[in-house]
Design a protein with these regions (language model features):
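Zn-dependent metallo-beta-lactamase
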Residues: 2-13, 17-20, 32-93, 100
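Cap/insert and terminal regions of metallo-dependent hydrolase folds
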Residues: 37-39, 124, 149-151, 155-158, ...
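Metallo-beta-lactamase
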Residues: 51-70, 152-216, 302-324, 328-331
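Pre-active-site segment of Zn-dependent metallo-hydrolases
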Residues: 55-68, 78, 84-130, 137-142, ...
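Short active-site oxyanion
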Residues: 72-74, 145-149
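Active-site-proximal beta-strand elements of phosphoester/diester hydrolases
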Residues: 74-77, 91-95, 182-188, 217-223
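Divalent metal-coordination and catalytic microenvironments
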Residues: 85, 95, 129, 136, ...
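Active-site metal-binding loops of divalent metal-dependent hydrolases
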Residues: 96-99, 130, 188-189, 222-224, ...
Length: 331
């Protein structure tokens, strides 16, 4: 079952060991994995040089009160894989990233779609995997007063400092439940490493989530790739046959040979939507950080072209602007 972290004082030594362990990993990664890191992130660094010299683009007229009394399901796209989901009286925040950079490499191109101070109290925050653009310790520190619970994938707790909220680890196909809100870990195609050299022992630390409350079901894909012949999305669709909305990544698109097993582009995202048998899909994970060969707007324009090919309407694939809040199911 999932594990819960307590605040007992007799665990101080264990917490210190975890911090020292994480620090050791960082140092080893810098020493032993620098060449690999340079090769895999060279374009991110190059595309970030100009971004680092300027502030993220400002967003006008941000929502200051996202709490809706007229909805069953509403979503506000904060940007990247950060989504504020309201299901009736529950609020879920996915992969919260509010910092300007991730891992000091990828620079935010545009501000988050809502100010942290304007977030509602969050019933549960979800971390899909340990990569820096999804697990941001600085962002967790920023939102700490707002969050009641944090769920991380298997093997993820070692990287979570001691916050005031409860932090729990959830294994594949296990379900966390509180006050009628159910969160189930479901499989995706990705990897779970955080510092490069830890990939050999972090082979389970990535997940998608099924969120269920009051008869509404939402799928959050985190980061995932797609490969022809895989059955895991169909399996998820069979186990959860009434998915109202699926959040799926549509970037980076390029280079496809490198990305295809780890990141879906628009074409593969539509395939996953169909295999999940989801009623609607909301694209995410694009045009946020300087971290790929994609040009701004490319992912969205490609998705719209695929929607035309597949005869999918704007009601079936919902593309949000940053900071936009969409009522998916009204009350």
């Amino acid at each position: 079952m999932w594990r819960k972290r307590t605040e007992e004082t007799n665990r101080k030594d264990e917490r210190l060991q975890r911090k020292l362990f994480a620090l050791t990993i960082v140092c080893l990664a810098l020493i032993l994995n620098s060449c690999t890191a340079i090769l895999s992130t060279s374009n991110s660094v190059g595309s970030s040089i100009s971004a680092l010299m300027s502030s993220p683009k400002k967003i006008d007229n941000k929502i200051t009160n996202p709490i809706r009394n007229d909805v069953r399901l509403a979503v506000l796209w904060v940007r990247h894989a950060t989504l504020l989901i309201q299901i009736d009286d529950k609020f879920i925040l996915t992969d919260p990233v509010f910092t300007e950079t991730t891992a000091f490499i990828s620079k935010r191109l545009i501000e988050p779609g809502i100010e942290v101070k304007n977030l509602p109290n969050i019933n549960v925050a979800l971390i899909s995997h340990l990569h820096a653009d999804h697990l941001s310790i600085g962002s967790l520190d920023m939102i700490e007063p707002k969050v009641k619970e944090l769920l991380v994938p298997q093997e993820g707790l070692v990287y979570i400092p001691n916050f005031s909220f409860n932090s729990s680890e959830i294994k594949l196909w296990q379900t966390w439940e509180k006050d009628g809100l159910k969160i189930t870990s479901v499989p995706v195609l990705h990897n779970g490493m955080r510092y490069g050299i830890d990939s050999d022992w972090l082979d389970k630390s990535f997940t998608g989530y099924i969120i269920q409350y009051n008869g509404i079901t939402v799928y959050f894909g985190g980061d995932t790739g797609y490969e022809t012949g895989t059955t895991l999305f169909k399996e998820t669709g069979r186990k959860f046959p009434d998915i109202d909305l699926a959040f799926l990544p549509i970037a980076p698109i390029h280079p496809r040979e490198y990305s295809k097993g780890r990141h879906t582009g628009p074409v593969d995202a539509i395939k996953i939507m169909q295999e999940l048998n989801a009623k609607k899909m909301m694209p995410m994970h694009f045009d946020t950080f300087a971290e790929s060969y994609d040009t701004l707007g490319e992912a969205e324009s490609t998705m719209r072209a695929e929607m035309i090919k597949e005869n999918l309407s704007d009601d079936e694939i919902i593309i949000l602007n940053i900071g936009e809040q969409k009522v998916v199911i009204p009350r």
